Amino acid sequence: MLNSSLPFYSTLKLLLDGSYTNTVFRDDAAQLEENSRDLLHRTSQINSTSSYLVRSLQPLVTDPSSVLTNLYYPEIDPATSNYRAHLRRETDDFSPGFGGLFTLQFDDVHLASVFFNALNVHKGPSLGASVTLCQPYVQTVFHKQKEWAGQCGLHESIVRVSVGLEDRRALFSAFRVALAEADQAKAARITDGLEEWKDGSESGSGSSRLTDNDSLTDVRFEK
């Protein structure tokens, strides 16, 4: 689909006309038309809900007790001005925004797994659905290329969220519950580490058995 108001419309249309074949079936076209009737309203709602969730979760990134270490979304990105320059124009039936996709990054894979399993939303690799979807992105997309993905800045401990049309306060409540589960897992691990350090000191070992590499690389997200 080409936007006739864009400067390269005529050039692109000429190129596409030379290779275009109409392969749209009648029932597909009917479904597309039905889905398009409230597209702008749905998109506006998803934009608004996503912004609300990101803004609500953002303070946790700087909280040392939180399992959340980073949050990725164009609205809060250092390069947000580049995105704002290309936002769709506001109209009576549409409020521009930054889309329904954002990414959470956690301390490590285990804590990301605890959050993922506790988050009461649909789980899946798609995006743009009418229901909120959650996906352990690197675990599913780059399962056999994790080292390469890490070199490109994609950490194993990220969870991608595609926001749907649910009530935004209900969604935020679900995120709070899941984050609380992960925070408890983090606190329990710290407590266990202190106990092990204490036991080790008393037995003369002089060091804790809990290390940064303590089996976390073996943790996998549950299916």
What are these regions (language model features)?
Residues 133-223:
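PLP-dependent enzyme catalytic core of the Aspartate aminotransferase-like
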